[in-house]
Design a protein with these regions (language model features):
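Signal for well-folded cores of large energy- and translation-related assemblies
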Residues: 28, 135, 184, 222-225, ...
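Hydrophobic alpha-helical segments of polytopic membrane proteins
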Residues: 60, 78-85, 145-161, 168-208
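Conserved phosphate/pyrophosphate-binding and hydrolysis machinery centered on Walker-type P-loop NTPases
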Residues: 162-165, 169, 223-227
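Membrane-helix boundary/helix-loop-helix interface segments in multi-pass membrane proteins
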Residues: 1-16, 21, 27-165
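Short helix-terminus and kink motifs of transmembrane alpha helices
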Residues: 71-74, 128, 132, 170, ...
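Hydrophobic, glycine- and aromatic-enriched re-entrant/interface helices and adjoining loop segments
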Residues: 99-108, 191-253
Length: 253
């Protein structure tokens, strides 16, 4: 059976922490959007209603994931990764065919009435693939050729396909996930450090290839004096601390 409804196998502390964070998020979203929602739509629950729909969908996915036997995911790890690579290629090819080579970033795949961001699927597939690989190769993971190199090459393929969308931040996040999971899997520290070193040699020029990537970093360090939209979130964080301090001004204020 692939579905297990026994509550004894759940990670209860993690479950309670997740539920707590969900409720905190609901309160924060409602508190921060109630005025804007009322001023723009004449009722105060527009944004929180959309947020609750997403929470409900996410909760259903979480419950399904809790009941799913993780051993079944082992069988899907390889095919799921290949499928995600196919989706990344399909997203880029279809977007180029429709909009040309100088088009905007090709990050979304339209499927009928909804769209999916294929890099998110790729990120999940990489996590499942690496978890399965580390479990199978735990005795050889410290060997570079037989243990460390194969997952590195697979993750590099995914990262390159995401970079050319272009979506540099997601690609960098996947690279970070790879390093963390291999570190937990007890890969050699030298292999991890060398991967970081050569990765930076490759990624830093790629980052400078697009001006907006560099601008995001410079606006972060000089954000309060940068009046462009790139620093909006950073400026608002300063304003919130200035108005409410550490304790804030209260819900809905």
């Amino acid at each position: 059976m692939y579905i297990n409804i026994s509550s004894q196998k759940y990670d209860k502390p993690l479950l309670f922490i997740t539920i707590g964070l969900i409720f905190i998020g609901i309160v924060m979203v409602f508190s921060s959007t109630v005025d804007r929602s009322f001023n723009k739509f004449d009722y105060s629950t527009f944004y929180i209603s959309k947020h609750l729909i997403r929470v409900f969908i996410g909760a259903l996915a979480m419950i399904f994931g809790m009941m799913l036997d993780y051993n079944y995911l082992k069988r899907l790890a390889g095919p799921f990764l290949i499928f995600s690579i196919f989706l990344l290629l399909l997203t880029k090819i279809l977007y180029l065919a429709e909009n040309g080579i100088n088009s905007d970033p090709a990050r979304w795949l339209n499927i009928g009435i909804f769209s999916i961001q294929t890099s998110d699927i790729a990120r999940l597939s990489v996590i499942i693939y690496l978890a399965n690989y580390i479990d199978r190769k735990k005795d050889n993971i410290r060997d570079y050729i037989d243990g460390f190199l194969p997952p590195l090459l697979m993750v590099l393929i995914v990262m390159i396909l995401i970079i050319i969308q272009p979506d540099f931040s997601t690609a960098a996040m996947i690279g970070f996930i790879f390093l963390i999971m291999l570190f937990i899997g007890r890969a050699k520290f030298l292999h991890l450090v060398s991967t970081v070193f050569f990765g930076l040699i490759f990624l830093i020029p790629v980052m400078y290839f697009r001006e907006y990537r560099v601008y995001r970093i410079t606006s972060y360090f000089d954000g309060f004096f940068d009046l462009s939209k790139a620093s909006h979130q950073l400026q608002q964080s300063f304003y919130s601390l200035g108005n409410g301090g550490i304790n804030g001004v209260g819900l809905g204020s």
